[in-house]
C-alpha cells in the first residue's frame, strides 16, 4: 500500500515514536515514549499523551511542554499498574495516543499501538518472555498466499494464521524481505512471536537477479527502515539479516 500523508510543518514523522518498557512485572510496568517532532527548533512543544489499556480505559497520562533541540526526541515516562502483559496466549494491546502542540496550537495527533512485555536472550539458557523460559514453536512463512499470489490479502492472512494457531504454532520467521504491516499487526493481535528479516543475500550472488545487486546501496537503509518500522510491535522479538 502507498499512502500520502499531509501534515503541518511541525509534526511527528513516519515511524516517529519509540516505545520501550524498561521494567515489567505483574505489579507494574514502566513505559518510556520517545516522540520525534520535525521542524520543532525554537518552538515550545507541548505533548499530551494518554496510555489506553486493552479495554479502552486511560491508565496513565502526561502533559509536558519544552523546547526541543534539533534531532532530540521528546521523552515521556509512565507507570502502568497491574499491566496486562502481551504473550502468545494473552495478546493484549495498549495504545499511546499523543496530541502535539506548537506555540499553543494543535498541529498533529499520533497513535502508537504496543504491548507490555519483556524479552531476554541468555547464553546457554535461551529465550525468556516476561521472565519465563520459552521455546519457539514456529514455522518459516513465505509472503505469498499460494494461488492468491503475493499481494496482501488480510482475510487470507488471518485464515492462514488461524490454521497455524490451531496446530500449536506460536512463532513465525518471515522471508526474505520486510514483512507487510498487515501481517505484523495480525501477529500482534493473534499472538505470534516473529523473527523478521529485510533481505536474503549480501554482496555474493545466489542468483543473477538477486539482492546482491543492491546490497551496497540499500542494505543499511533497508535494515534501519525495518527496525524503525516494527520496533513498537510486541510480536517482533528478533530482527535479523539472513545469510
Predicted regions span which residues?
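Solvent-exposed loop/turn segments at secondary-structure junctions
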Residues: 178-180, 200-203
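Secreted/periplasmic carbohydrate-active enzymes, especially glycoside hydrolases
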Residues: 1-186, 190-194, 237-238
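Alpha-helical scaffolding within the catalytic cores
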Residues: 121-125, 180-184, 214-228
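Conserved radical SAM core fold
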Residues: 142-147, 201-207
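Active-site groove signature of glycoside hydrolases
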Residues: 223-240
Amino acid at each position: 500500500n502507498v499512502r500520502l500523508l499531509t501534515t503541518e510543518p511541525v509534526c511527528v514523522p513516519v515511524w516517529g515514536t519509540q516505545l520501550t518498557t524498561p521494567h515489567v512485572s505483574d505489579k507494574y510496568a514502566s513505559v518510556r515514549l520517545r516522540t520525534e517532532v520535525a521542524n520543532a527548533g525554537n518552538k515550545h512543544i507541548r505533548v499530551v499523551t494518554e496510555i489506553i489499556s486493552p479495554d479502552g480505559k486511560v491508565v496513565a497520562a502526561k502533559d509536558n511542554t519544552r523546547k526541543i533541540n534539533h534531532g532530540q526526541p521528546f521523552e515521556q515516562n509512565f507507570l502502568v499498574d497491574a499491566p496486562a502483559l502481551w504473550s502468545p496466549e494473552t495478546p493484549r494491546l495498549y495504545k499511546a495516543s499523543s496530541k502535539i502542540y506548537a506555540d499553543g496550537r494543535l498541529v498533529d495527533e499520533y497513535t502508537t499501538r504496543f504491548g507490555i512485555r519483556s524479552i531476554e536472550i541468555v547464553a546457554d539458557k535461551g529465550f525468556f518472555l516476561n521472565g519465563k523460559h520459552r521455546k519457539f514453536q514456529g514455522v518459516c512463512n513465505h509472503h505469498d498466499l499460494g494461488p492468491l499470489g503475493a499481494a496482501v490479502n488480510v482475510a487470507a492472512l488471518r485464515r492462514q494464521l488461524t490454521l497455524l494457531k490451531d496446530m500449536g504454532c506460536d512463532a513465525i520467521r518471515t522471508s526474505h524481505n520486510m514483512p507487510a504491516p498487515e501481517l505484523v499487526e495480525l501477529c500482534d493481535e493473534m499472538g505470534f512471536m516473529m523473527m523478521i528479516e529485510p533481505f536474503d543475500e549480501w554482496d555474493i550472488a545466489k542468483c543473477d537477479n538477486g539482492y546482491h545487486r543492491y546490497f551496497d546501496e540499500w542494505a543499511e537503509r533497508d535494515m534501519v527502515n525495518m527496525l524503525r518500522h516494527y520496533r513498537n510491535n510486541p510480536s517482533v522479538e528478533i530482527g535479523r539479516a539472513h545469510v
